[in-house]
């Protein structure tokens, strides 16, 4: 089965608390092979990304309503689309699930005026680097990004400008 058979569902259509609990319960599956330890993975799933900021998050569901992947993200006040986390179940990796989730996020973000999308990865995270390159994101080393000695790589992709809103014709 391909990623095209999946249904992307925005968090706003789901029970935020139940979804967060479900994804956290399966985090060892979704994050298998990640360079992040379990505490770091759990910390990515702050409740605010499900409750208050869930409008940009999405889960990819199989025809059997199983979770295949998900994305947590937000657009900041200065119009930067920030990917907090993207994870794909190992059974679905390599099928375009992350690409579909990220493209959905980018389209939503551009629609509200975001100029760029950004994610942060650990140096040497080959999976994140490959996905970023596939999507046209540029990597930039960020020494001390997460504190002294906690270097990261910032992955940035420019987003297309949303078409300007045309004012209504006052004669109509």
Give the predicted meaning of each segment.
Residues 86-93, 121-123:
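A short, internal acetyl-CoA/4′-phosphopantetheine-binding micro-motif in the GNAT/acyltransferase core
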Residues 99, 123-141, 147-150:
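Conserved active-site alpha-helix within GNAT-family acetyltransferase domains
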């Amino acid at each position: 089965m391909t990623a095209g058979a999946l249904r992307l569902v925005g968090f706003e259509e789901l029970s935020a608390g139940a979804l967060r609990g479900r994804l956290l319960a399966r985090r060892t599956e979704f994050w298998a092979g990640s360079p992040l330890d379990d505490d770091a993975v759990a910390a990515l799933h702050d409740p605010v990304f499900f409750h208050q900021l869930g409008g940009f998050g999405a889960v990819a569901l199989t025809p059997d309503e199983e979770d295949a992947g998900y994305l947590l993200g937000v657009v900041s006040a200065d119009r930067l689309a920030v990917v907090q986390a993207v994870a794909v179940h190992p059974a679905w990796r390599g099928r375009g699930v992350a690409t579909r989730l990220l493209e959905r996020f980018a389209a939503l973000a551009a629609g509200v005026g975001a100029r760029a999308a950004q994610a942060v990865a650990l140096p040497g995270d080959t999976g994140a680097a490959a996905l970023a390159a596939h999507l046209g994101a540029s990597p930039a080393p960020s020494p001390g990004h997460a504190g002294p000695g906690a270097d990261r790589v910032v992955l940035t992709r420019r987003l297309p400008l949303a078409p300007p809103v045309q004012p209504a014709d006052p004669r109509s």
